[in-house]
Amino acid sequence: MSFLRLSSLSRSRSLLQTRCLSTHGHPFVFDSRHEYMDYLEAHQSRLPWGFSVATTKFDFVPQEAPHLPAKMTMTLIKPVKPTSLFAAVFTQNAFPGAPVLVGRKRLNEPKLGAILVNSKISNVCASGGGVADAEEVCENLAKHLRLEGGSQVLPCSTGVIGWRIPVDSMVENLPKLVTNLQSESVLPAAEGIMTTDLYPKIRSMDVCGGRIVGIAKGAGMIEPNMATMLSYILTDLSIPRDVLRQLLTEVVGDTYNSLSVDTDQSTSDTVTLVSSDQIPFDMKQLDEFKTALHEVCLGLSEDIVRNGEGAHHVMRVRVSGALSNEMAKGVGKSVVNSPLLKCAVAGNDPNVGRLVMAVGKYMGTYHKDVNIQRRMKIRMGGVVIFENGEMVLNDDIEAKLVAHMRDAMLIEPTRGGLDASSHNYPPHGKFVEIEIDLGVGSKETQVLGIDLTHEYVAINADYRS
């Protein structure tokens, strides 16, 4: 895959929106945040028919930490009329947030009229009744939007666990939020849901006479098992409710569920798919729509990992020759979650014995009766590094591995390993490519992950302040 400089191309909307190209990351090399933001605004952010979005920001004082004055952003996503065509999947964490508990109930409601997202506080395990707080805000928003009731509002929260949301401050700022609604661009919403994210994430495709637009946030506490972080996918095509729900479950499985930043599954993970019911849909085109939906979700997954907290490299692990999908994904997750391998990649260190260790750790724990030792072949950057039960290494190969990892770097660390500003835009869509053929079956999958750097520790040691 070659990467093009955005400035070298004409700004033709038809050229850039033909397809999402998410399976290879963004096809462009961005030289600045301004160039990336211009690309999103000009070529990705147009809303499907029948949607509007808004954001508003305000200051508040957390009751659990009055010494830490904070800022909250509320983001509103609204179909032109309440719609019965909506789907959602949520975290499987045993301590789900109050918004997740409310959201699961919303799936049984006949219609959805709005999605409300707040940053800074996740409303998880908060004393005093997190569900009641979420419902109170939903009821008040419903009044401002003239909906039938709060049951038509889906709440989502992201941020600090254990704090209670500032209901009074949120309710006070709802009128301004509603006033800010606009139907041109999803970019304000993509920016509004960010927390430790360094840049907004938008993917879109025109398909079947309509449009799909997706946004997502998430940079840490990421290893989903049902959904991931917060992601909102909008379409104007009138696809039946039961079909949307089946499609979302299927697509999430090998996109969002096949990535990991730090192995920690959030208590608030939510993915929604909502139709504004504006454009008739021919069910004969369902496969085409599913392919486009998969592209959008995979693209957002790649964007999330590329903006993982402290990330200097993104690893793409392709596992083949497995006996089952579970085995393939398990091997891939074991590799991208290995702290030793993640550190080696961060340092452009070709210590690939750690890669073999990570595969063996998983297989020895979960599939000890399957002998892969002399059947497995591993490549990094297209170079064979393990075959016939032995490492294949020499000075020339190690030099190629170092060059491959350096070429995939997102940022050049400053002296001491820390970079104060980090990367606030994705400079390219390259990966540290790892291919693992287990040689015992026909199942295959792809898993994404990042390296482990000083910045990750610094960010998470100082998150609340």
Curated annotation (Swiss-Prot):
Compartments where located: Mitochondrion matrix
The organism's place on the tree of life at top rank: Eukaryota
Keyword DNA damage: no
GO biological process annotation, one example: ornithine biosynthetic process
UniProt keyword list: Acyltransferase, Amino-acid biosynthesis, Arginine biosynthesis, Autocatalytic cleavage, Mitochondrion, Multifunctional enzyme, Transferase
Catalytic activity entry: N(2)-acetyl-L-ornithine + L-glutamate = N-acetyl-L-glutamate + L-ornithine; L-glutamate + acetyl-CoA = N-acetyl-L-glutamate + CoA + H(+)
Task performed by this protein: Catalyzes two activities which are involved in the cyclic version of arginine biosynthesis: the synthesis of acetylglutamate from glutamate and acetyl-CoA, and of ornithine by transacetylation between acetylornithine and glutamate.
UniProt protein name: Arginine biosynthesis bifunctional protein ArgJ, mitochondrial
Species the sequence originates in: Phytophthora infestans (strain T30-4)
Organism ancestry: Eukaryota, Sar, Stramenopiles, Oomycota, Peronosporales
